């Protein structure tokens, strides 16, 4: 990928220069491993909410999502019921898509139902693709891989 220099002279992916939010995300999070069950659960949920929307929309609402979904603590989110769904549907700070809200609650419940000794981190690690050369263009980045399809099947199997 062609890197562009920002106002500070640092080279970055072209998309990172589109906004301050993207710039901060690029410099501090993008391409870096995520550790811890709550952090992994947050990323999984936010990626789900992003479907059909731009990532910048989710980044700008991320703090509101964290508040609305109890810091993405799977134990707390799994306990959400109809009253919480109704409240979330009225929260203009998040993406108010009932199917995505219910999927997030369902995913928290599925995470808690994993067999003893299993974790979201371990499940994701089992499906990590082998190391490959860094992509040079956007066309080099596949929309899906054998590993991503396998992970998707396993996640669906767990609920």
Name the predicted role of every residue range.
Residues 1-159:
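HhH-family (HhH-GPD) DNA N-glycosylase catalytic core used in base-excision repair
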